[in-house]
Amino acid sequence: MSTNEQLAWDFDDGDVAAVRPDTGIARFAPGSEQWIAALQPTDDDAIRLDRFDVNMMTAEAAARLWARVAAWVESDQIAYYIDDSPVSSDAAYDARMRCLERLEAAFPSLDNPQSPTHRVGGSFSNDFTSVRHPSRMMSLDDVFSIEELKDWYDSVIRDLDWPESKPLPMSCEVKIDGLALNLIYRNGVLEQGLTRGDGVTGEDITLNVRTIGSIPANLGGPKEDVPDFVEIRGEVFMRWDDFHTLNNEQEDAGRAPFANPRNAAAGSLRQKDPRITATRRLSFYAHGLGQLTWGPDHPRGTHDVVADQSQAYDLYTKWGVPVSPHNRAVTSFQEILDMIEYYGEHRGDIEHALDGIVVKVDDLGLQRTLGATSRAPRWAIAYKYPPEEVNTELLNITVQVGRTGRVTPVAVLKPVYVAGSTVARTTLHNGFEVKRKGILIGDTVVVRKAGDVIPELVGPVLERRKGREDQLREFVMPEFCPSCGAKLSPAKEGDKDIRCPNVESCPAQLTERVISLASRKAFDIEHLGEQSAIALTNPEENRPDSVATYAPNITEVLVAPGEEPDPYEPVEGLELPAAQKPVLSNESGLFNLTAADLRDVRVWREAAIVEVHETVGANGKKKKVRKRVGGSGLWHQVPAFWTAPTPAKKLTAKQLVERAQGEAAIESAETQGDTASETTGAPTGAEAPLGTMPGFAAASYPEYDVPADAVIVRVDHKTTRTGVTDVPVIIRPGENTRKMFDEMDKARHADLWRVLVALSIRRLGPPTARLIASAMGSLAAIENATIEDLTAIDGVGPEIAESVVNWFAATREPGDWRGATLRAWQAAGVGVDEAETSSLPQTLAGKTVVVTGSLEGYSRDSAKEAIIERGGKAAGSVSKKTDYVVIGANAGSKAAKAEELGIPMLSETQFAQLLATGTI
């Protein structure tokens, strides 16, 4: 990467990752400069890339195409592996990856360790401690046709010089669509659970792993079968029945359901609170073996190693570690095809989402002979099934407004099951795409997915239109923003996307910005998620159009199986409540919010239709079974941040004594103070309650548990055997609300780079924000920086620099909302801390170091951080100004450049010495 080249992962959803339609690419000669510039990250253009012969290109054109496609693949990897929110279909992603691989094969200078083709999985988030894997955790190469699979099979036979007449033992197993996990056991005890991360370093998620019931805390079986040390590789996933149960619970709680089991498993495994993970019913199957050590004193002896995959699985079974039942031993290519055909027909019948079939050479010695590339073993391959296509009805086309104001049409589909999940909505990108596909509302349409990712609406089934023409209608893009009513228009001439220009106060844009600033890559306010953001910025979302669907006292509609709900008739005189004003009209007030501000915020929820029937259990007793079958179309309001009115709990005798003792101790301490405060109310320093209703003082009900932050809203008169008792009914901030405010307090002291990301500066993502924050040191310095100042920072390109400078220039305009936000945040203590300086010795001060190739002890990012933390400059390209080049495995053209310029080249061991001492 050149000094000022834009980092691919710094583009936001309005740039590289945005999915746009064909821009007239067919008019240009394939491989030409115009053709490359016209390419867009759409499925259609991905197909073009897949069919394109890269060997006809010049080296210069190939480099341009590589950079463009690599940026899209980088964005896809970030979205899939880090955000758990894929933006492209598997088919499109795989086509782009194959294009990169062909380019790198045809033009070796493009092949470098930083290429997405060498990346194992995705980089990890910063929520958990980074830990090095004892042995590298590889990914798998994919093939998408029987021909490609046969080529791999033949290459294995050829590389092993295997006799044609001799069967080669292999194993076949289903490829689980979950998250890779490395379990580390020492002397039979689970020591750590690590995510794959980049293959060298993963996240320590041990606490969450311990909550997964199928993972044993201690290895079982005879003592002589338990090694001193072992790494067990496998997959964490969610079974279909557990996934459906979780989504029902999500919807019943008013939370958005997960799109598919992989996303559900990922979100569950990365919870900061292990108690949440424990409720998610995750499962685990082992599928590989890492480092294995029996130890010198072990009965088996140090040389008694596992010989093949089958023996490893036998050991796992003895230890109580689950292995997928969907595996077979095979000895011929035809048996592999039989396995693929069987699960292709029965992929919907197994207990989890299926992502393909994995084929492995069974013998571990032969595996070592075959070796591996920089990212994947040569002794294994994953066959991916082709995309599934199904037909369904296009019920409607609505529009949604994104964070950058882009207005996107969304297809509302009759729910249909495809490739592992139920699909009810999918993006159509823009109005031109709708016209290009030729779809009409009411059409029968084709929907497809490759794996469990975002679906694509392919087009209409034209034969189904016959005789239904009067039921079809054309979609027309709106002229005005559906969220704020502003006039819509393209951002610049020639744009096919239309945008809402009301950046400051459009509720939809504001909601998306709040979601973004609270995300892990910014302030990391976990309990300020999508639903909370909507409640703060647009609480009237989903407000009924009329009283006909307003049912304030109906939270669910119970029906017998197969029955329809009774028609709803609103009571006479019922009126819709007055519309609420949002608590936040822009981001500036976020850090000034108090719990009291949120007390009356209510959001709209749809009453669920629940089927109820009785069944007889194994014990002969009857029990009621409830099943959520959909929405009723009836709406009611619920508190968004505070609890519903709840009778206070009566204290036990023991609790009353403990309270009295605590109050006496406080009173004694105050009385003995050197300077007692003369007060008539609460003692000095005591936090007053958020407010109580007149006449309802908490002190009037000493026998009840009324928390300090609670409000007594009424008093119920409860009749008991001893007479009438007054019971206070309270509301208080919910647990999630209290956690949200705690996290917001921590965010006031967030790292400077996180503040920059939270400001939603166009094109500025976390990596470049880190570079700028580290180089400039303070928000004040960044505010006053010029484009030249920023482009002088290695890794900051002119487009990003201009965007940052323009953003801060706008803050100085009178009345500008960005300036108001910045000043309000600074007044609340946000962004006033200077960037932390490293406490490590500055052994590399003034030195420029380039790292190329794969290092065993460092990921790409951790190597750069190690250099920067010691005062050095981690450059992306080799020049005369470079002091050292660290050479890892599979180093590319940078090594040749260093040799040409006579720059010292270091091994990983020498790199460690350089970090420690500054010399070699």
Swiss-Prot record:
Domain of life: Bacteria
The encoding gene: ligA
Known function: DNA ligase that catalyzes the formation of phosphodiester linkages between 5'-phosphoryl and 3'-hydroxyl groups in double-stranded DNA using NAD as a coenzyme and as the energy source for the reaction. It is essential for DNA replication and repair of damaged DNA.
Keywords: DNA damage, DNA repair, DNA replication, Ligase, Magnesium, Manganese, Metal-binding, NAD, Zinc
Presence of keyword Zinc: yes
Compositional bias per record (Polar residues), positions renumbered to this chain: 669-682
Protein name: DNA ligase
A GO term for molecular function: metal ion binding
GO terms for cellular component: cytosol
A single BP term in Gene Ontology: DNA repair
Record-linked Pfam families: BRCT, DNA_ligase_aden, DNA_ligase_OB, DNA_ligase_ZBD, HHH_2
HAMAP family (UniProt xref): DNA_ligase_A
